[in-house]
Amino acid sequence: MTEDKDAPLREDIRLLGRVLGDTVRDQHGEAAFALIERIRQTSVRFRRDDDNAARLELEGILDALSREQTIEVVRAFSYFSHLSNIAEDQHHIRRSRAHLIAGSAPREGSVAHALVRALASGLPPARLAAFFDTALISPVLTAHPTEVQRKSILNCETDIAHLLDARDRMTLTPEERQESDEALRRTVLTLWQTRMLRPAKLSVVDEVANGLSYFDATFLRELPHLYANLEDQLVSRDPALAGLELPAFLQVGSWIGGDRDGNPFVTADVLERTLAMQAGAVLGFYLDELHALGARLSLALGLVTASDALLALAARSPDHSPHRNDEPYRRAISGIYARLAATHHALLGTEPPRHPVAVAEPYAAVAELADDLDVIHRSLVANGSAALARGQLRRLRRAVRVFGFHLAPIDLRQNSEVHERVVAELLATARTGTDYATLDEAARVELLIEELATPRPLASPHVRYSDETEGELAIFRTARAAHRRYGGPAIPNCIISKTDDVSDLLELALLLKEAGLLRPHERALDVNIVPLFETIEDLANAPSVMDRLFALPGYMNLLAASRDRTHEVMLGYSDSNKDGGFLTSGWALYKAEIGLIEVFARHGIRLRLFHGRGGSVGRGGGPSYEAILAQPGGAVQGQIRLTEQGEVIAAKYGNPEVGRRNLEVIVAATLEASLLADRAPAPRVEFLDTMQALSDVAFAAYRGLVYDTEGFERYFWESTVISEIAELNIGSRPASRKKGTRIEDLRAIPWVFSWSQCRLMLPGWFGFGSAVKTWLAAHADDGIARLQAMHREWSFFAALLSNMDMVLAKTDLAIASRYAGLVKDVNLRDAIFERIRNEWHDTVDALLAITGQRELLDGNPLLKRSIRNRFPYLDPLNHVQVELLRRHRETHDDARIRLGIHISINGIAAGLRNSG
């Protein structure tokens, strides 16, 4: 009899559903529970059979709901979305553990699998270890308007996950099982009685605190675990590597508190507070770990020996308790704790919760703390206690090297237009008669190069500048102060949004010079200047821009002297998609990478790409492993950064084990893409030509709908929740860059989020069907065979179709048609929705023909089962949301209806898992 591997998942979903149902019944009565069940069953009939009678019945039920009933229904299905996600995550952990326990071959996407592949290719373990000496792998957390999880909710969900995990790993006695059941009921009740939404709009500081919760839950402990596992695997394959300690190649960065592009609430004061909050979190973690370590290392002289360095460290400790005279390790740790507590006070101005034994000198730099911990490590290893050095001390030493006193590197980001205005104002006051804004590109570059070579600053303390200019200068001065206070890694990068020419980079360089972060006479540049190319046109021009930049001798000298001849370039997936559609965006990004690889190689500069990916496929999302391996050869080279945005952060890193698995996937993919890429054949020329032809048609189809169809803007605003998203207290940043309803001014995030909420997912697929249909008409003989060969042989094209497959499977035209019904102009509604419907069918037909699948997701049975399990509980939320939108737009002033809409947005985002 074949084992049903998904039976435990279904059991967990039933368990959580039953507990939630019991909670609803207890809190609101049998009638409320029966109503929710009736809606669920009717929705299932509607989804399963496209049953029009079920649709009419459902509309009748929803139309008759009172306001209070509506809130109960929305909350019930929203929380079930959250609970089913917990069950699914637990099942992934369960299956991974079963795989390891069975001793099966390493799974694709694991570090073990990557090492096996690399070793099989002939690379020795020592070469693999050396790879990490120059590697940099960094997921970067960003705060965006799709991040809808409250920390209170996350805490409840973490408790539920722990309870499920305990039931999984242990054989419980009847009494223990009863205690577990009661704890589960208590936690679900707490969840039900916890407000899902914030009463006020998030501040940036709130977003910082939310981001810090993932460090506490996952990163601070799981990164050291991952490093240790990787080191152990390398040593097991080559004993000569014993004692291997890899450099801090894997770091988790952050934009939260440093991203000023379109967010006026990110100020110098906020940046300073962010730095302090991060430092407080990491110092508190170190102090707690040291306290626990001191309790464990009770080794006594006479039973063990200790190194002279350790004895000297103990002698310098302010801990003179007679009870610890013969316990040098404890005394040494007490001394380290005292110095770290003093560092806490010096950096933050506050005492830690647990006071040291006495006052001590603070650490001047994190390297001093690392050196003291190394003394303990070496003494343990040299004196018969190596096993003790491999436990908590090893993890703490690793954490100190990764997180420093700053916790997470913060990127600064600002729009190039802001830099331009600030530079123009500074030049106008420092060089009378200079009108920078009127200069052409060549004149701008000449002037900026001249100013960069001039020692004097442009800014004068005697001039009153505009608020914008004062604010920007204050940010860079705060960054310089942060370098002195927390170390250079605290703020390593400055990113320029909307980069379109060389002057954009030089403008930032000039502003860095004003703050002392760039010192040309020393050939010193303290941060990376990172251009962000976002639109289709800017992506096409990116190689040319960097080529002309590298032709400037002064700039190249800075790279050679201060940046190790490495330059980072960020590529924007979100805006390029909104600009040109899914297919054209993906192709434009691929071509930009090929062009950049050639330019950087010609100039002898190492390329580091920063991928600005969102959670949804429409914003470059999708599985990280496939995405990294789909990069063109030479694009990774051991260095990669990528954004982790919106609700994806909670989904990927809310659970520690899931978080470690996701970090491992990024490391494994980077290892394979860097070391094995030259073994993959380059795509055939005819593949590239075909892709260009497909892109041209897809671009025309997408632009024709979104930007050239009269009334489309109105259709979008009336058929989606975009207006309501703008009201929701989610992120600190406005949904649009400018006031108004123009799609050009709308941020890519709420654009994609809105299409996800109405279940059309349009940015993730529209245009592909038209492109394939048109191209096949012109290549009737061998067209489909060529497309199938592209899918089979070219990882880029395969990943593109795999992501589209996922999005198409999550699309629901029947539900989307109900949202279309919100459009008041019937002719406009029918014309546009019919066009979208036809394109969806053409796209599905094209995808199935190319991949050879009979149904969507045949090649991804795991996701197919997940959708089958979860979506019957997600669909009712959409149906209720449509009814709520209808009522809201008729009344506008009903707070309970607004609340229901906002809760439904949260629940649908949770159910889709990658909607923003």
Curated annotation (Swiss-Prot):
EC number(s) reported in the record: 4.1.1.31
CC cofactor: Mg(2+)
GO terms assigned for molecular function: magnesium ion binding; phosphoenolpyruvate carboxylase activity
Pfam name, any one: PEPcase
Annotated InterPro entries: PEP_COase, PEP_COase_bac/pln-type, PEP_COase_Lys_AS, PEPCASE_His_AS, Pyrv/PenolPyrv_kinase-like_dom
PROSITE patterns: PEPCASE_1, PEPCASE_2
SUPFAM superfamilies per the UniProt record, alphabetical: Phosphoenolpyruvate/pyruvate domain (SSF51621)
HAMAP family, per the entry: PEPcase_type1 (MF_00595)
Function: Forms oxaloacetate, a four-carbon dicarboxylic acid source for the tricarboxylic acid cycle.
The protein, known as: Phosphoenolpyruvate carboxylase
Protein's gene: ppc
